[in-house]
């Protein structure tokens, strides 16, 4: 496999970047559109949808279940019924949202549906969701990929207890389909911790936007009443998690990066993202339709609990590795990342140490002591976030090569182009002002149709 030489920015990066739509919001909107269509409410439109491997897998899954998806690029329409054909088989790839959101949908069908995925996906946690479906009366063969869901045309619902310590997607997957259950659904989380809670809040917010009656006022308990799921137009926000890699470029280079389309009010965990950037002495400026981050001249190590936003861990670990030499950062609340696309804690520790850094695992996180890094290969482990972390390291360390930049197709197929356009031909442009006759670079992922 050909490696990707990560561009280096010997001077501060100055750029405006447009990132495509949110993967998390796109796939939730697609599931809700499918449920609305299956209830006979009509077609829904998704505008600004992300087109990436994860969302293509979701589109394929819905079509496998018998639904119809029309449109090109980022404008999609979902209609039809849940009527899977004989031998229906859903490919989950490495997409956790497909793996955990689609089985409850399949339970509403009337024929068995087999689920499988990439070899690497077979280690991802799924048993608690399958056990919950069994508790609700669904026949399920298997405890992990591959498994088979035997739909019988309806699902009574009721109350289910589930340990979602390994993934908040277990809860979201049940809640998304719950309004179509005869008696609705009450979900009680029984585990000691709940990672990525803002993503459950996103699910609840989008259910309300679809007219679903959901009560999440009691911690670790959610109640969805049976009723209609409205067909509607979904306008997808830019993917703020993907934007963090680009904003990190401003932090590590002392430059300025502006993200277009940053929402004033978001269903994504925007506040958590901005709090981390401010902790690193970055200046965050909101405009009407953008967010600008001005990086510091330097920053020390930091302590941060990433339980709510574990997806940010690879980017934050890269920032920690590039902090002031000798300073120590502690990343906590992320034990669940051992069950993500790869064991992200082990992968980050291995790769930072491979480049001469000092990183060790703890029971629920990482401790990183910033030391000068050297050139070398950064392995991505087929993980999009790991590939992006290698790109961040490469901004400051010449000679870093990412072994599998194509892993970014999972959520951002345009990443290599956007990154190169942001950095420019071998270097960034100075902050606070570009040189005479020059303008800040602009990188956009819109209109690609991905």
From Swiss-Prot:
Gene Ontology MF terms in the entry: 3-phosphoshikimate 1-carboxyvinyltransferase activity
Its EC number(s): 2.5.1.19
Keywords from the named record: Amino-acid biosynthesis, Aromatic amino acid biosynthesis, Cytoplasm, Transferase
Main location: cytoplasm
Pfam families from the UniProt entry: EPSP_synthase
Binding, phosphoenolpyruvate: 23, 96, 124, 169, 344, 385, 410
Any one annotated GO CC term: cytoplasm
SUPFAM superfamilies per record: EPT/RTPC-like
Chain intervals for the UniProt region annotation (Disordered): 426-450
Source domain of life: Bacteria
Residues annotated to bind 3-phosphoshikimate: 23-24, 28, 167-169, 196, 311, 340
Catalysed reactions, semicolon-separated: 3-phosphoshikimate + phosphoenolpyruvate = 5-O-(1-carboxyvinyl)-3-phosphoshikimate + phosphate
Pathway: Metabolic intermediate biosynthesis; chorismate biosynthesis; chorismate from D-erythrose 4-phosphate and phosphoenolpyruvate: step 6/7
GO annotation terms (biological process): amino acid biosynthetic process; aromatic amino acid family biosynthetic process; chorismate biosynthetic process
Role, per record: Catalyzes the transfer of the enolpyruvyl moiety of phosphoenolpyruvate (PEP) to the 5-hydroxyl of shikimate-3-phosphate (S3P) to produce enolpyruvyl shikimate-3-phosphate and inorganic phosphate.
Complexes and interactors: Monomer.
Protein name: 3-phosphoshikimate 1-carboxyvinyltransferase
Organism encoding this protein: Mycobacterium bovis (strain ATCC BAA-935 / AF2122/97)
